[in-house]
Amino acid sequence: YNENSRPLPISSCEPFVLRNDASLMNGALLLATPVAHSAVPLHRLARKVLGQTVGIALGGGAAFGLAHLGVLQVLERNQIPIDLVVGCSMGSMIGIAYAAGFSISDMIEKAHEMGKRSKMIMGIDFSLSAPGVLAGNRLRDLYTPLLGSKQRFEDLVKPCRTVATDIESGERVDIGKGSLEDAYRASIAVPVVISPIKIDGRVLVDGGVSDPVPAEVVRDMGADICIAVNVVPPLKKGVEMKVSQYVRQLAKINPFSFFARDQGFPNLFDITMNSMQTLQHELGNFKAISADVRVNPDLSEFTWIEYYRSEEIIAKGIEATEQMLPLIKKKVGMACEWKKTE
């Protein structure tokens, strides 16, 4: 040890010394991002310098995405550090709230509240001009106020990105700066169901069309260890058709639906969402291949619209993550657990 070195204690491991020179500053610059104004915590900087940065990819999936809350709760309880987060569709909404610094318990409480049928009805606003059944404005009005003063990526306490899809080129669009409202609104714009929006001249829809489990983006952000969560289950005969009775009742007032009655076809919402579910399950598993750990909650008994079953869905996320804990701890090196001072 000499006066030009500074020891960095790491729990019960041998003391580790980082030189007090440009190498440490370079590590800090690697961790700093143009969207993070808050100071970088020492333990996160140390993980970056030592190649142990942990990132998580939260996949899309409408109500299935509530399982992410269970995943994050287990990681938090077991002191698994998450340095950065990338979300798709419902995963983008949860990822943003997590990166904003909200506690998991508060997020779960809000999920239960928002999952009430009365709240779901409040989120319905039919579009009269935009290319989608729902305009999406009421969904925005319900969620954005929950973020409080955190309205831009620059306000977040953890690095975060969301993904959307350019419907004209098919390209994945990574969003990591500017308005959080625009970012999650683009990421949840399920084709046909929720109207797309324009950002920087690009027409954007649900990120699940191009990358439902954005593990690759987690790597691009500099994560050394990636945890990927695919919450979308394969279709199960008889379960996927239990889509909300609200939709079926609304179809009865559509004059054009008269000609399609009694022909044995699912309604428009069933066809669209079942198609998206099949796509996101298969493509999501493929996109998650590069992750170090893959968490797949068993949500085969649920449907995409059952937000009112939030408690059960979150429990499935907890169960799946607990099963993967030994591997997660091994990958993040919990033998040398970081003592958090954040």
Residue ranges and their predicted role:
Residues 57-58, 204-206:
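Short hydrophobic beta-strand that contains or immediately precedes a catalytic carboxylate
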Residues 59, 68, 81-100, 211:
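Catalytic nucleophile loop
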Residues 146-158:
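A short alpha-helix-loop-beta-strand transition element characteristic
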Residues 37-85, 126:
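Helix-rich "cap/lid" substructures immediately adjacent to catalytic or cofactor-binding pockets
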Residues 2-44, 54, 104-146, 165-179, ...:
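Non-catalytic peripheral regions of patatin-like phospholipases
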Residues 70-79, 100-106, 178-181:
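A glycine- and small-aliphatic-rich helix-loop capping segment at beta-alpha/alpha-beta transitions
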Residues 144-147, 185-196, 207-213:
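Active-site glycine-rich loop that binds ribose-phosphate moieties when present
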